[in-house]
Structures are given as C-alpha cells and as structure tokens.
C-alpha cells in the first residue's frame, strides 16, 4: 500500500507541477501570484526529484544482490559515498 501511495503522491505532484507551468505560461497571473506559483513549483520539483532518486536507488539495490532480485526497504545509511 505504501508503494501505491508513493506512486500516487509522485503522480499528483507531477500533475500539479504541470498545471502550475501551464498557468505561468498563460501569463494571466499577477506578479504576486506568479511568484507564489513559482515557489510551489520549486517545492513540487524537489518532491518529484526526491521520489525519482529513491526509486533509482531502490532499483540499484535490487540489481546488486548477487544476481538475485530481492527487495529491501531503502535506507539513506546504505548509500555508497
């Protein structure tokens, strides 16, 4: 269930980001509203990037397990430096 929620959160964040971009591109927002939308867009972009990074790291963990696909919870402490 957590995976579905994370995927939905990513999908919703991406959809929200696309909607913000469309509103900004239309040029109908005031300067203040444009700045607010831009700030929201930056937050959404960071959220999406974080979700993509975690997914990429999980794929790497799955592929690096002696040729066997095993799934483990992602932990920042396991990241190679």
Curated annotation (Swiss-Prot):
<dbReference type="InterPro" id="IPR003761">
    <property type="entry name" value="Exonuc_VII_S"/>
</dbReference>
<dbReference type="GO" id="GO:0006308">
    <property type="term" value="P:DNA catabolic process"/>
</dbReference>
<dbReference type="GO" id="GO:0005829">
    <property type="term" value="C:cytosol"/>
</dbReference>
<protein>
    <recommendedName>
        <fullName>Exodeoxyribonuclease 7 small subunit</fullName>
        <ecNumber>3.1.11.6</ecNumber>
    </recommendedName>
</protein>
<keyword id="KW-0378">Hydrolase</keyword>
<keyword id="KW-0269">Exonuclease</keyword>
<keyword id="KW-0540">Nuclease</keyword>
<dbReference type="GO" id="GO:0008855">
    <property type="term" value="F:exodeoxyribonuclease VII activity"/>
</dbReference>
<dbReference type="Pfam" id="PF02609">
    <property type="entry name" value="Exonuc_VII_S"/>
</dbReference>
<dbReference type="InterPro" id="IPR037004">
    <property type="entry name" value="Exonuc_VII_ssu_sf"/>
</dbReference>
<comment type="subunit">
    <text>Heterooligomer composed of large and small subunits.</text>
</comment>
<comment type="function">
    <text>Bidirectionally degrades single-stranded DNA into large acid-insoluble oligonucleotides, which are then degraded further into small acid-soluble oligonucleotides.</text>
</comment>
<comment type="similarity">
    <text>Belongs to the XseB family.</text>
</comment>
<keyword id="KW-0963">Cytoplasm</keyword>
<dbReference type="GO" id="GO:0009318">
    <property type="term" value="C:exodeoxyribonuclease VII complex"/>
</dbReference>
